[in-house]
């Protein structure tokens, strides 16, 4: 059948248009669908911990930048004309074809890094001429849509490095126990050649071949004047990694909290200070060993920066609690009986209300309050006691009377405004036991409320004449991409619950508490710093607060 010339030209144009549209939309979006590990970093980007991806791979999210040494080694080994080619390298393809003809089998693919990114993004397929051609076409499309730097980062984030290790960052931590930015020339060269034969990293395999490939790359760098002779000689002396390193586990409960609550991202920059977090874990381990003698197997604490409300250290449970003692539970977020840890807030609110002054006398006598008979911890009564002394000694009876006079509903409302969201029931559910531990609160909420006491006082001292009460801030533990701390809790826009004057008097009173153990005679040393602190013991002696 003979078609008119116009028809043939029209069909040719349609075919070209269809081909162009296919080429335009040929790249998958997103290019990679594999899941990433959850990664937790401190405020300076130091790795605090990571959780394996859903498919069992250690695959960190692609990095924002690549270290110079690794990039230099990678391009020297894999793709020397990377910055000049359009996605495929005709010279490399021609050389690979000749090598394969001489060997009688496929010994070289001639793929550029861009082509390898395309291959990594697709499910494993047989290596054939048509697959290679398809990779070339998609590689040119990738070059048109991404910068060279982005392509390098895509490769570094998804290349296989042996076993279940994928990507440069995971490999750097697993094999050398350090971030990629700190890799030596020998380490960078090892990771640059490893994706070519990732199985060589395993003990028992032909690791001599891996060493030879690494050293050959180092000699090439020396020959190309990218490595000086001293660095070259030192690099040759470095051994290969003998075994995988465990990834850091400095804040596992915080990482799990992010993984469960924030699914839109996989890399979290926290407000934690890595050095302080390490010190906090060591402190927790020391106390854990001591507490085990008393059959106490769980502990938790947080460290706040008062001025900003940022969390600097977060220990969610005893480091070695294990499954036997529910070591996976984040005790920082677990509601527990408050004991007497809420008494300072009642003291401060009563001061603000003009109900008491520090020397005001409160009744400490046997009492029957609608069938409730409060008792002190030492099971005795002092008759009448100054409010300040009642707080210092944490007497129960005077504070029950103070709560009755101040108003149960009123105090319950104050606590809610201070951020105690765990008090989910109405005030009458707790009754006057609210100030003795009848309600459950979390360490997270307590840290925020006590931090608010100190922060308002700090702000007042910085500018007493221009002081304006600030909003209540829950502790902040997550940094935004810009480096500013984000508040993952609701901020209160209501007027301040406690005035600076009441906060000052409350904290000064709490300075007078007797310190435990070896710190009992701290005031005898001129270098000692004053601290305001409060303890609490829950019903049944299940929990101890400080």
Language model regions located:
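Glycine-rich, acidic and aromatic/proline-enriched surface loops and short helix-turn segments
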Residues: 119, 123, 157-164, 181, ...
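Active-site SXXK
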Residues: 73-75, 221, 280, 309, ...
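A penicillin-recognizing enzyme superfamily signal
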Residues: 270-291, 301-305, 314, 322-332, ...
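Flexible glycine/proline-enriched surface loops and loop-helix/loop-strand junctions
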Residues: 54-57, 134-138, 175, 197-203, ...
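Conserved catalytic neighborhood of penicillin-recognizing serine enzymes
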Residues: 102-127, 181, 244-260, 307, ...
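Short, well-structured active-site flanking segments
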Residues: 83-92, 166-169, 228-232, 325-328, ...
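Mid-domain, small-residue-enriched loop/turn segments at the edges of structured enzyme/sensor domains
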Residues: 373-376, 407-448, 466, 471-472
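Juxtamembrane regions of bacterial inner-membrane/periplasmic proteins
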Residues: 1-293, 306, 310-312, 317, ...
